[in-house]
């Protein structure tokens, strides 16, 4: 696998994936984006499609279970990884992003983690409107909707609501 580089915002997309796999929950936030520790949605599944036609699904364990995440490729189980391994990788990745120098940088050892996760890219495919797709469980209603989320990172420069580029046209 070639050396992967990205900016802090791009690395943050991979960080969010690993964080959610490690902790199995998505916390709510207040109007100022402060984390509400006691209000969260359990994450049941995370979905990615880095390569067209290759749908990767991460099924998170019930909190009472053995803390093992099951990975499926096109609905076929391919491997398992432990949440404790993801927790360790999440902490290391966080500090690598915070300490990353330059506009784009690489992170030592990340290729193996990505290979273990069957992840070939650090960020979502540009054609997707959502950066990450999750199946959450709403403990208040009992529903388990599939929701897409956009990821905006505060680890580098302040995030913008609009990513200006060649296709941005007013």
Language-model features: locations:
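Short acidic loop-to-beta-strand element that houses the catalytic metal-binding Asp/Glu
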Residues: 45, 127-137, 146
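Conserved catalytic cores of phosphodiester-cleaving nucleases, focusing on short active-site segments
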Residues: 20, 132-134, 147-153
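Glycine- and acidic
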Residues: 1-3
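An N-terminal, globular interaction/scaffold subdomain
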Residues: 5-8, 14-112
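Short N-terminal edge-element motif at the start of the domain
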Residues: 103-129
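Extended alpha-helical scaffold and adjacent linker segments that couple domains
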Residues: 77-81, 85, 116, 122, ...
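Short loop/turn segments at secondary-structure transitions that flank enzyme active sites
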Residues: 26, 138-140, 153-158
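Mg2+/Mn2+-dependent nuclease catalytic core
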Residues: 145, 151-170
């Amino acid at each position: 696998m070639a050396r992967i580089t990205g900016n802090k915002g791009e690395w943050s997309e991979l960080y969010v994936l690993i964080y959610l796999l490690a902790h199995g929950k998505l916390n709510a936030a207040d109007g100022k984006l402060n984390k509400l520790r006691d209000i969260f949605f359990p994450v049941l599944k995370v979905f990615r499609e880095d390569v067209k036609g290759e749908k990767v699904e991460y099924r998170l364990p019930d909190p009472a279970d053995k803390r093992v995440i099951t990975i499926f490729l096109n609905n076929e189980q391919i491997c398992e990884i432990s949440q404790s391994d993801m927790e360790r990788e999440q902490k290391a990745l966080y500090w690598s992003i915070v300490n990353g120098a330059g506009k784009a940088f690489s992170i030592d050892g990340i290729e193996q983690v990505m290979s273990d996760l069957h992840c070939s890219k650090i960020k979502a495919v540009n054609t997707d409107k959502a950066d990450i797709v999750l199946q959450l469980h709403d403990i208040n209603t009992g529903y388990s909707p599939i929701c897409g989320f956009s990821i905006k990172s505060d680890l580098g420069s302040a995030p913008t609501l609009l990513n200006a580029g060649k296709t941005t046209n007013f």
